């Protein structure tokens, strides 16, 4: 399944090139379909590898949708083309965020969820850059709009971020606290963050800072879990806790 226009639904008005999204992999529920979760891979990966892991989880009532990011030049890699949800340079407070790329990917994800049945609970999860995109989607949901001002169309029920960070963290609090409705949505959205203390790719401090920024912005249903000895990868204990979180928060 290919989606050929990355700016569908994002309302991009610039002349920048629209990147083509890769293949989307779907893991069908083995039991009664109660929830659909988009799962987003990390930089340079694809949806296939995560779909195989997710299929093995004891969550029979969840449908997993694992899209593949567009291949685009990535500043962090010296402009080398790579599968990436958005462009990223160094991870720092001063590095500008690629909000056009983030909006494009967030819109692609929302479009995938928007075709699900009305009674199905919806969520977004991801690893590393995928986690960053999931957290950006959480802020779009709370604000009711993408960064470019176009309306965000999906009602999210949960967010999971493994080894990631929050793009645009500096401005999230002011944006959300400026709207009663945004503050209400932020307070209602369960977010589960996990991060390894030995992560050398996205250091643990970025997970801590993201958790702090989300908490200050009013995301009250927030959990942050640290793992001793864990680098930039996942382990069964972490995925077990993801399963427990989803069962509890989605009532599966």
Labelled PLM ranges:
Residues 42-45, 70, 128, 165, ...:
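Active-site glycine-rich loops that stabilize anionic/oxyanionic intermediates
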């Amino acid at each position: 399944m290919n989606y050929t226009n990355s700016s569908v639904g994002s309302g991009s008005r610039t002349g920048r090139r629209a990147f083509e999204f890769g293949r989307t992999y779907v893991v069908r529920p083995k039991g009664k379909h109660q929830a659909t979760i988009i799962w987003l891979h990390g930089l340079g990966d694809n949806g296939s590898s995560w779909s195989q892991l997710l299929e093995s989880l004891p969550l029979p009532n969840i449908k997993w949708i694992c899209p593949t990011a567009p291949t685009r030049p990535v500043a962090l890699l010296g402009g080398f083309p790579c599968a990436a949800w958005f462009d990223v340079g160094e991870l720092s407070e001063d590095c500008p965020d690629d909000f056009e790329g983030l909006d494009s990917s967030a819109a692609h994800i929302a479009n995938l969820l928007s075709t699900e049945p009305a009674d199905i609970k919806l969520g977004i999860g991801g690893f590393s850059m995928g986690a960053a995109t999931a957290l950006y989607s959480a802020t779009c949901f709370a604000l009711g709009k993408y960064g470019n001002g176009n309306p965000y169309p999906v009602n999210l029920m949960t967010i999971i971020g493994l080894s990631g960070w929050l793009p645009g963290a500096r401005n999230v609090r002011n944006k959300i606290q400026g709207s009663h409705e945004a503050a209400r949505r932020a307070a209602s959205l369960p977010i589960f963050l996990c991060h390894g203390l030995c992560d050398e790719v996205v250091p643990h401090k970025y997970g801590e800072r993201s958790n702090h920024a989300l908490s200050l912005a009013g995301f009250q249903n927030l959990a942050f879990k640290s793992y001793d000895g864990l680098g930039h990868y996942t382990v069964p204990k972490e995925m077990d806790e993801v399963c427990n979180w989803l069962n509890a928060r989605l009532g599966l």
